[in-house]
Every structure is written in structure tokens, then in C-alpha cells.
Amino acid sequence: MSTTPATPKVGFVSLGCPKALVDSERILTQLRMEGYEVVPTYEDADVVVVNTCGFIDSAKAESLEVIGEAIKENGKVIVTGCMGVEEGSIRDVHPSVLSVTGPQQYEQVVNAVHEVVPPRQDHNPLIDLVPPQGVKLTPRHYAYLKISEGCNHSCSFCIIPSMRGKLVSRPVGEVLSEAERLVKAGVKEILVISQDTSAYGVDVKYKTDFWNGRPVKTRMLELCEALSSLGAWVRLHYVYPYPNVDDVIPLMAAGKILPYLDIPFQHASPKVLKSMKRPAFEDRTLARIKNWREQCPELVIRSTFIVGFPGETEEDFQYLLDWLTEAQLDRVGCFQYSPVEGAPANDLGLAEVPDDVKQERWDRFMAHQQAISAARLQLRIGKEIDVLIDEVEEQGSVGRSFFDAPEIDGSVFIDGDHGFKPGDKVRCRVVDADEYDMWAEPI
């Protein structure tokens, strides 16, 4: 009497940024198409894949810790992702890992899984229940859309180009077809991600591709125009403040894409920006922000900054605080500088900022920006907003407005049971706010 072969099972841990999450989704989609079952525990898996982060040393430490945990609990571990470019460092700590690959090495990861636990020979991918949009690790109502790999910048604090390579833009027709599948599957919000969204298409000289039989240039403006036709929220992340960003502001003002820009300014002091090898035109940037807001008063700007970069003086830091007062950014994150192995900043010969000074500056930065953010959110009280529901709890619902990207920004809280479910879009009036969150009532 024949028996049905057991379904091969894979455990998966995804660390790091949304771009790494998209890599994980691609690998999982391929494995699911080949009949593998993805399981949530180490003990139920035949093999575990760990998609690592290698952006800063603390992320590497977390990656090594998770690899060790997977080895202890399962024993069969495949490593991929950004830290995978440092195979020696990984094998020095965990010599028993079965395979180590870098980011975007989808085929190699799948092949490594095959070697440990081959796919079932009787599996028919034509009848497998893999959705057309692939496997997604986000809630059903929003998804990340990665438009390119790599980066052409050489920021002194960053090693991403050495891990992910130079900019490689995905064909715009392919990107738009993926977005269309996502929306048809119920996605209400598309979060556009890359290492440098504003540079999309530079590497292919903005060549024309085709989507649904019509020509579309491989460029941020044309991509946004096409995405706006799908009927979902479109949110732009990792945008550099280049002149071509001016072109998408009218789309935001017209309500075609969300009036939201995620721009990693990193600092404001010209001296520090020069050391970071970042664009050092802070005065032009302020003028650009003012111009954007004149065209689109609803515009929300989120950014991230680094304090305590080598050579940063109290004067530089105060310059940054003054710049924040001028810029009036809405959503801001801040990190204390942490040396990254292999980063050019290590060789600049600049004075290190003591840890206690970094902490003190971080505290001052956060207090300064929280006051700005709180004041800006207070201006929303009494106004109407659309809220996309993320969670429904016993005491009420939690969602987000155009102000709020998932995971990194604030939330909108709606008290009471209104019968909402995740993915619903609800028109509300803001009744209260603090420095991060808003409270609203359905209209």
C-alpha cells in the first residue's frame, strides 16, 4: 500500500527593513509554488531560512543571535540576506550553517533548501493554492512594492552598496503588473520602496516599457501616475530631495497619490553632511520644502537623522535643531551614530563623539522634534480624514491616515465597536492628538 510523501516544511525568519521583507516574500512564494509548507515554529520545520540584516553592527549581532537560536532549536539552518556577504564572519560564529548567500540570491536559497529537503515529486504547481500576488508577510490590506535594487550613492556611514550593489531598476511594466495583482487581491495601500526611489530608471536612461499595451517611462513620475490609476493609496518611501521630486507634488495635490514623502535627510549641518557624503544643500532643501507645501498644503514629510556622527560638534548639533525648527517636519526618527564595519566613515580620521554626548544629543533632538510633531498634529483636530483600519480590538479600532506609514509612524484610534474590519477605509473627524497619534470619531 503506497503512502503519500510528507509535505516538506520550511521555517522562515525575516530580519531588517521592508526591502528585505520583499526578498523574503519572493523566496517564500517560490517555495510555496514548489509545494513547501511554511511553518511558524522551529521544531515543525525540516529546515530554517534566516534572512539577515547587516546594516549596522547591532543588526549583525541580532542576526547572529537568531541564527544561533535556529541552530539550537532546529539544527538545519540556511542563511541569506545582507549579512550573508560576510560569510566568514557568520561561519566563524556558526560553522554548522548549511549555506550562506547574500541579498537577492533567491535561486541559490531555493536550491539550498532543495538539497536539505527536496520538493515532493508528485507536486503539481498548476493546482497549488499560491495567490497570484505571491506570498505576503504584511496584512492583506497593504503591501510593499520594491521598484529597484541597490544604490548609486556612497554615503560614508553606509555599506549597502557593497551588500546590494549599484542601482538596478525593475522594468516599470513588471512593477505595475505586480501592483495591479496586489490591488486585485485586496490591497488598499501600496508602499513604494527601494534604496533611492527618486533615482528610479536612472540606470536604464528612463527607457520606455509597456504596461497593459501602453508605453510608460521607467521614471518616478510616470510610475506614480500609473500607480494612481489603480485606486489604492500610494505612499513613497526612501525619496532623496532631488529636483525631480518637484514633479510628483502636483499628483499629491490632486489626490492621486498620498501627500507623504519619506526623505532621509540624516543631518543639516553642511560640515557633517559633507563628512557623510550626503547632498549638502540644506538651504535649498528648506526652499524646496516650502515650495512643496505651497503647492500641496496637506503634505506630510517624514525623515530620519543621525546624531553623534564623527566630528559633530555642539555647533553642528545646534544647527540641526535650528534647521528642524525651520523645516517643521511631521514625522521624524533619530539614531545615535554606530560604527559599521567596512564603512568609509571609519577612516575619516574625525573625532569620535562620546557615548554620553550622543545620548544627551539624542534626548534633546527627540524632545525638540516631539514638540514640533505635537504642534503639527494639533492642527488636525476638528478636520476630516480617511482612516485605513489595521486592527480591531475589544475597545475599538486602530488605523492610519495619510499621515502614517505602518510600523514607523503613529496611529489613529477610534473608540467603540463600529463593526469595522481590517482593510476598511473610514471617514472620520479628528478629536484629539499628541506628538505621535490621533484619536478620531467616524462621521
Curated annotation (Swiss-Prot):
The keyword Iron-sulfur applies. PROSITE patterns: MTTASE_N, MTTASE_RADICAL, RADICAL_SAM, TRAM. It is an enzyme of class 2 (transferase). Pfam families: Radical_SAM, TRAM_2, UPF0004. InterPro entries: Elp3/MiaA/NifB-like_rSAM (IPR006638), Methylthiotransferase (IPR005839), Methylthiotransferase_CS (IPR020612), Methylthiotransferase_N (IPR013848), Methylthiotransferase_N_sf (IPR038135), NA-bd_OB-fold (IPR012340), Ribosomal_uS12_MeSTrfase_RimO (IPR005840), rSAM (IPR007197). It is found in: Cytoplasm. GO terms for cellular component: cytosol. Residues 378-443 form the TRAM domain. The keyword Endoplasmic reticulum does not apply. GO terms for biological process: tRNA modification. It catalyses: L-aspartate(89)-[ribosomal protein uS12]-hydrogen + (sulfur carrier)-SH + AH2 + 2 S-adenosyl-L-methionine = 3-methylsulfanyl-L-aspartate(89)-[ribosomal protein uS12]-hydrogen + (sulfur carrier)-H + 5'-deoxyadenosine + L-methionine + A + S-adenosyl-L-homocysteine + 2 H(+). [4Fe-4S] cluster 1 binds at residues 17, 53, 82. Catalyzes the methylthiolation of an aspartic acid residue of ribosomal protein uS12. Keywords: 4Fe-4S, Cytoplasm, Iron, Iron-sulfur, Metal-binding, S-adenosyl-L-methionine, Transferase. Its EC number is 2.8.4.4. Belongs to the methylthiotransferase family. RimO subfamily. It comes from Pseudomonas putida (strain ATCC 47054 / DSM 6125 / CFBP 8728 / NCIMB 11950 / KT2440). PANTHER family: RIBOSOMAL PROTEIN S12 METHYLTHIOTRANSFERASE RIMO, RIBOSOMAL PROTEIN US12 METHYLTHIOTRANSFERASE RIMO. One of its GO terms (molecular function) is protein methylthiotransferase activity. This is Ribosomal protein uS12 methylthiotransferase RimO.
